[in-house]
From Swiss-Prot:
PROSITE patterns in the record: ATPASE_ALPHA_BETA
Name by which UniProt lists this protein: ATP synthase subunit beta, chloroplastic
The protein's enzyme class: translocase
Native source organism of the sequence: Illicium oligandrum
Gene Ontology biological process terms in this record: proton motive force-driven mitochondrial ATP synthesis
Annotated family: Belongs to the ATPase alpha/beta chains family.
Length: 498
């Protein structure tokens, strides 16, 4: 831990005594800087450019060293806009990597990539900071206990349960509901979760960051009256930020979460929305750094960059980090290098389907595409495992029959297949659920469904006890009792119409 040399406070006065260089080239967010012989900064060192632009405005840009070019020159990536910078400007080497505030005083606050508060609530009351670049915990320190993390979302808890202290990915293309699902998980887990949470907004909409902040305040997760009692720290590097900020803001959020795990020995929730923007930001600066592009134009260091971030998100004997990450899937292609590289690091994958979203089934989670390492009889129990497998088998059979139904119609199916299709359609609708965070859009109050209730509901559908109920009774309800009540209401309504 050290005093942060890149933010305002007692560390800044020492900057003037540091190593000085001069800008020799500026290409967008990438700067080339020349230093005196024998005074080259290290890779990942933080550099600060101070001065005035042509109209006299104060400039204060922080950069990170990426390459040593030879001839006493380095190449660095800026963490903020490079507008107004000129060749010949003085650059100060801080002599240390970018460091951000950590600890209890970060809770209830919003930070940028540099660890500077951006919520107009004054400076952060801490002198404890931590560098954003660290090595992952040693293998011997890791924790290997298996336990389920209940989310209250039926499709997730039944078919792809989340591991406490694991890494979870929400995969989906544009506009299928990743952010709504991650906000619902924050709502269901962070409120009920006794520990602390860190939320990293990486290259997403500023509006969504603002909505999340307002919702946290309304729910009491952020306590406005006594900020020290808050349960979450927010770190934002939104899509209007330069690629340097989007490339490093995930590490800033992770560094804050690691402190709670390692020093405070707490169980931490880490939400990252969206991990693909971290990859895209790296791709943006990769060519400017002179690297040859790899597959589909991505940076050749894609696997290394992803691995260095993901391997730090883990559970140790001191505490755990349970991370939930949204993963944007370009053009709905799961074989794209960005989602494909992310897959390898995850314990559970929740895949969102555009086909289900088009049908109006939300959350649009694909029951056959979503997977979890936790769905084993010895971990979840025989009853849960058996129910999940039967739901998947029924859904798979329905998928196989859809072409026949489209060409010949339902009447050409065997009696057994017709029954399978009817139950599969009920299952498909029962996997939908009204969300708390979507109440303003749907007008339906949100529902939290416990795991035992979820298993009971699907067992009743599979057993045939509810074959007589109309399939629309299962759409957007909580537990199975609500579905039977809705069926009775539909029956009463139809009688009144007659």
């Amino acid at each position: 831990m050290r005093i942060n040399p890149t933010t305002s406070g007692p560390g800044v006065s020492t900057l003037e005594e540091r190593n000085l260089g001069r800008i020799t080239q500026i290409i967008g967010p990438v700067l080339d800087v020349a230093f005196p012989p024998g005074k080259m900064p290290n890779i990942y060192n933080s550099l600060v450019v101070k001065g005035r632009d042509t109209v006299g405005q104060q400039i204060n840009v922080t950069c990170e060293v990426q390459q040593l070019l030879g001839n006493n020159r380095i190449r660095a990536v800026a963490m903020s806009a490079t507008d107004g910078l000129m060749r010949g400007m003085e650059v100060i080497d801080t002599g240390a990597p970018l460091s951000v505030p950590v600890g209890g005083s970060t809770l209830g606050r919003i930070f940028n990539v540099l660890g500077e508060p951006v919520d107009n609530l004054g400076p952060v009351d801490t002198c404890t900071t931590s560098p954003i670049h660290r090595s992952a915990p040693a293998f011997i320190q890791l924790d290997t206990k298996f336990s389920i993390f209940e989310t209250g979302i039926k499709v997730v808890d039944l078919l792809a349960p989340y591991r406490r202290g694991g890494k979870i990915g929400l995969f989906g293309g544009a506009g299928v509901g990743k952010t709504v699902l991650i906000m619902e998980l924050i709502n269901n887990i962070a409120k009920a979760h006794g520990g602390v949470s860190v939320s990293g907004g990486v290259g997403e909409r500023t509006r969504e960051g603002n909505d999340l902040y307002m919702e946290m305040k309304e729910s009491g997760v952020i306590n406005e009256q006594n900020i020290a009692e808050s349960k979450v720290a927010l770190v934002y590097g939104q899509m209007n930020e330069p690629p340097g900020a989007r490339m490093r803001v995930g590490l800033t959020a992770l560094t804050m979460a690691e402190y709670f795990r390692d020093v405070n020995e707490q169980d931490v929730l880490l939400f990252i929305d969206n991990i693909s923007r971290f990859v895209q930001a790296g791709s943006e600066v990769s060519a400017l750094l002179g690297r040859m592009p790899s597959a589909v134009g991505y940076q050749p260091t894609l696997s290394t960059e992803m691995g260095s971030l993901q391997e730090r998100i883990t559970s140790t004997k001191e505490g755990s980090i349970t991370s939930i990450q949204a993963v944007y899937v370009p053009a709905d292609d799961l074989t794209d290098p960005a989602p494909a590289t992310t897959f390898a690091h995850l314990d559970a994958t929740t895949v969102l389907s555009r086909g289900l979203a088009a049908k109006g089934i939300y959350p649009a989670v694909d029951p056959l595409g979503s997977t979890s390492t936790m769905l084993q009889p010895r971990i979840v129990g025989e009853k849960h495992y058996e129910t999940a497998q039967r739901v998947k088998q029924t859904s798979q059979r329905y998928k196989e029959l859809q072409d026949i139904i489209a060409i010949l119609g339902l009447d050409e199916l065997s009696e057994e297949d017709r029954l399978t299709v009817a139950r599969a359609r009920k299952i498909e609708r029962f996997l939908s659920q009204p969300f708390f965070v979507a109440e303003v859009f749907t007008g339906s109050p949100g529902k939290y469904v416990g795991l035992a209730e979820t298993i009971r509901g699907f067992q009743l559908i599979l057993s045939g006890e509810l074959d007589g109920l109309p399939e629309q009774a299962f759409y957007l309800v909580g537990n199975i009792d609500e579905a039977t009540a809705k069926a009775m209401n539909l029956e009463v309504e139809s009688k009144l119409k007659k």
